[in-house]
Amino acid sequence: DVYKRQEKELPYFAATLTAYLRESHPELLSDKHFIAERSDHAAQTYERAVRNGNSVYEALELSNAVLYQDLRFSKYDAIFEVVSEWFPEIVARQRTAFCLKLLPVCEEAFEMYDLTDDFESSPSYKNLLLELTGLIQTHIERHGIQ
């Protein structure tokens, strides 16, 4: 029965999305509406693809495109990369909280770029990392690492 199958698929997509958000977009983790809506859309895409004769692999590929749309590039991951590489004084156990605190601080750098899903592979990505390094250094000089 299609309805029962979709009921089972929704928790899979919600769990998958939640795990991804925890790693790359922790600022979105509390947005239960977003998670439910995106997961539901992915489950519907999967169900529709299977019903239309696509293989399970193809259906998962289509549903993952929906699930991760506009989430491939992560501001948090970019900040985390800079902090991990250039600021060893931020110990591993403090990095997540520190990087979350830096999201609003670094927003001015992010606004200068077109942050598409494939931005990380663009030449501009290195420029962004340089901008972030400067902003983070200035923030630490003014406010410390608390």
Where are these regions (language model features)?
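Short, small-residue-biased leader/transition segments that mark boundaries at the very start
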Residues: D1-Y3
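Acidic, low-complexity proline/glycine-rich segments
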Residues: R5-E9
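N-terminal interaction modules that seed assembly of large macromolecular complexes
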Residues: L10-V66
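Contiguous interface-forming segments/domains that mediate binding rather than catalysis
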Residues: T16-A19, P26, F34, I90-R95, ...
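Charged, low-complexity interaction regions
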Residues: E27-L29, G53, V91-A92, L115-S122
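Long, charge-patterned amphipathic interaction tracts in eukaryotic proteins
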Residues: D70-L115
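Long, low-complexity acidic/proline-rich regions
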Residues: T96-Q146
